[in-house]
Amino acid sequence: MDLGHSLFVVFTCFLMARCRTEIGKNITVVVMLPDNHLKYSFAFPRVFPAIRMAHDDIQKKGKLLRGYTINLLNHSTESQGAGCSESQAQIMAVDTKLYEKPDAFFGPGCVYSVASVGRFVNHWKLPLITAWAPAFGFDSKEEYRTIVRTGLSTTKLGEFAHYLHSHFNWTTRAFMLFHDLKVDDRPYYFISEGVFLVLRRENITVEAVPYDDQKNSDYREMISSLKSNGRIVYICGPLDTFLEFMRIFQNEGLPPEDYAIFYLDMFAKSILDKDYKPWESSDINWTDPIKLFKSVFVITAKEPDNPEYKAFQRELHARAKQEFSVQLEPSLEDIIAGCFYDGFMLYAQALNETLAEGGSQNDGINITQKMQNRRFWGVTGLVSTDKNNDRDIDFNLWAMTNHKTGQYGIVAYYNGTNKEIVWSETEKIQWPKGSPPLDNPPCVFSMDEPFCNEDQLPVLGIVAVGSGLALIIFGISSFLIYRKLKLEKELAGMLWRIRWEELQFESPNKYHKCAGSRLTISQRGSSYGSLITAHGKYQLFAKTGYFKGNLVAIKHVNKKRIELTRQVLFELKHMRDVQFNHLTRFIGACIDPPNICIVTEYCPRGSLQDILENESINLDWMFRYSLINDIVKGMNFLHNSYIGSHGNLKSSNCVVDSRFVLKITDYGLASFRSSCENEDSHALYAKKLWTAPELLIYDRHPPQGTQKGDVYSFGIILQEIALRNGPFYVDGMDLSPKEIVQKVRNGQKPYFRPTTDTSCHSEELSILMEGCWAEDPADRPDFSYIKIFVMKLNKEGSTSILNNLLSRMEQYANNLENLVEERTQAYLEEKRKAENLLYQILPHSVAEQLKRGETVQAEAFDSVTIYFSDIVGFTSMSAESTPLQVVTLLNDLYTCFDAIIDNFDVYKVETIGDAYMVVSDSQSRNGKLHAREIAGMSLALLEQVKTFKIRHRPNDQLRLRIGIHTGPVCAGVVGLKMPRYCLFGDTVNTASRMESNGEALKIHLSSATKEVLDEFGYFDLQLRGDVEMKGKGKMRTYWLLGEKTDVYVI
């Protein structure tokens, strides 16, 4: 009984543990929103499809929360007929927490509902993500520490207003008018709240006046208050009330040119829905609307213009119709749904990191901390959060840009990430008075200043003021004239000019044997980069020289002469003025025909392309991000300088100096640039791999390029650094540069771009690449954005400059150590091969003497045995065969012979045609064994030749004839080129005669050899008799038949 009870308890515990494990794989997300989509831009029909889209993307792609299932629950926070309900939101939050155990909340949207639920989730330590709730109060993280806002924040709007005031020098006062019914969600109150509080925080006096159109607010009283309190006006309320205010403003006769009126219209209903003319939405009979609205500006949220947002918008509307039967029209309100989508992705990323670190899925404190100071690309563009978990929002500033038609255009936008206003280069504010109005004009709000008295200034005062003004005008004029004269003097002085005679091409101190450095040069003439020719890529020595004792890089210009126009002089002056750590320093230019060249700073480490293509250099990601950061810094400075753009940015134009700092070269001096490639040359297309699509349509695009074109080129360089597979690498496709350029130029969707591989680099880097090489130049980020983005990616790069430099030096030293070790091993291997070759050419003892540098002396030997052989009938066989067949025959035969003689103590002296000569005891001094070794070798060769097959004549038998003789010789090395080990003496001649007087397939030997072999007693010899030898007379000779099998050999 006890055993059964124990088993039951164990089984129950197992089931409970298993159930708890399965539950842990589920993530429950509660979405709480109102239902009325006509009233709320964050209602269920608008937002829930976006959240479901994010949910589906996460579950399908599997990159985030792999193995987890996300369950979405939805609850309404709206009371029937009453709009947003704070109590309903509280009840739904508590019930959900008790019965459904959620891991996160999304919504509710309404400010008061978010505030009440936010206090609960703060206590439960669960995250609450919303894309609305703009109230200033949520900045308090002591009370709302787990709230994350991925949409509009009134604080961010206030910061934009503050930057506007700083730009226009409005530092004293402002006036605010906002609509407030004090019921429901009070959207206009909370939107204007941030502007009021931020300006007040900056010591600007702000008079705020609420109004309620349902209580017949007196607009004339508002106008009276406005006249007494401000000239910089902010109005936040329904469009019809704003236009009514402007009608009264006009009727009261206020001069609009003295005011700057900003209408806070977050969703641009006054602009986008009204043909870009705000006043056309009402039936008001305007006297002169264009004159009136010249001083009216509209501040809206900035609509994302990336392709992902457009696709998201289309799918959002389709899902709203399918799931809620609601027909949505495209509007700026869709950005709220997009921000909820990005908020869901932000939560998924933070949760994924928490789980990967072993954390809990309901640890809201840790999860929300991971959402702080984060940056990634979402459907609404760059998503950047601050330390308060509020998203950095961008805003547009609209103004009347066409004073004839009255149409509005965007004159600036506020970059919330960079905290700066970016002014349009084409659309400008046209102030009625030519300059912004004053926020605190003299003698209007205060009469305390002395000059506000109606009495006229005394004569002395008038004289003093006039004299002062005259002195100021004289001083300004003198300064301008001085600057003009100084500029002309600099242009005429030509401080940049270098005479050809001043350049030296040998070291003044003769320290270096050559002035070249192992860099690469481009076909266009750059001192750096890989030389790409029609036949491939080659590394050459860059042209370098010495100027005033310093080593410099010299780039020759393919022009007959340079016309020194004023434009060229200004280009040269600007080049001389540019000084930055990440740009190569311009030293000067030589314009003496035909030696026209540009002289720049010399960087000894080579180009970035060289480093990437050198597989022996190991680049970790800290080093790579450091190189990327150097490029971004250099290009950001260049784009903000007089030069403006590069026009030919590529990896070969990024060079590394001795301190491993990357610098950009070959910029500026557009007048010096020329092209010498043939129109259809391989090099021309290879050079265009970095060129943006919009510039490829030109046969010769502007030499100075464009800033957006430089961003595209930077994207290609990013891919080079990330994959190290060369420029414009496309996985699985082997295309020529011409084919690649033509595909990019065609511009057909899907756009042809290089391969990204998130297994080799981060997903954020892939997003940055794709953003940089976007087809539409307007979609590409500026280098100011890229700089911040890269700094965010390069978390390790936040260390000091010294630590970064030391890290680079350490990595380079490690690379050098590995390279030295590899080169040493390669050297030893080549040395071994050379020694083996030497041992094959010369005897071992002679080779050792030569290696030691000793002179090889001729040497006499008392007794050696020499072997000669040739092939009987070889001449006729050669006549009947092709030369290639003869070579093949001899190679096969001698390869076979060489393998056999390795088994004997012999040395092959030479082969001449079919003749084969071998000697024994010329170096080893093996007593009388030399005769035995040659005899044994001869028998082995004769046996092998009987089975040898001729490839082209397989039925023919090779007939080998062998001759052997023993006697004294003299040996030595003859010659310096191709030295040969030669034997001299009558023994050599006699051995040759023994072979020539022998018979096929027999071994013919002399009596001298026979006497030595008899001492061994196991060779079978047969007397041939006396044979007449040329020059020798008659000699008694013998046949070697084989070895005796019945004799025991010791």
Swiss-Prot record:
Topological domain spans for side Extracellular: 20-460
Gene3D superfamilies: 3.40.50.2300, 6.10.250.780, Nucleotide cyclase, Transferase(Phosphotransferase) domain 1
InterPro entries: A/G_cyclase, A/G_cyclase_CS, ANF_lig-bd_rcpt, ANPR/GUC, Cyclic_nucleotide_synthase, Kinase-like_dom_sf, Nucleotide_cyclase, Peripla_BP_I
Family: Belongs to the adenylyl cyclase class-4/guanylyl cyclase family.
GO molecular function annotations of the record: adenylate cyclase activity; ATP binding; GTP binding; guanylate cyclase activity; natriuretic peptide receptor activity; peptide hormone binding; protein kinase activity
Protein name, UniProt field: Atrial natriuretic peptide receptor 2
Residues passing through the membrane, by range: 461-481
Record note on modification: Phosphorylated. Phosphorylation of the protein kinase-like domain is required for full activation by CNP. Glycosylated.
Domain Guanylate cyclase: 865-995
PANTHER family hit by this protein: GUANYLATE CYCLASE, GUANYLYL CYCLASE
Enzymatic reactions: GTP = 3',5'-cyclic GMP + diphosphate
Keyword check for Lipoprotein: no
Signal peptide: 1-19
Disulphide connectivity of cysteines: C84-C110, C236-C339
Physiological role: Receptor for the C-type natriuretic peptide NPPC/CNP hormone. Has guanylate cyclase activity upon binding of its ligand. May play a role in the regulation of skeletal growth.
Domain Protein kinase: 517-790
GO biological processes: intracellular signal transduction; ossification; receptor guanylyl cyclase signaling pathway
Organism whose genome encodes this protein: Anguilla japonica (Japanese eel)
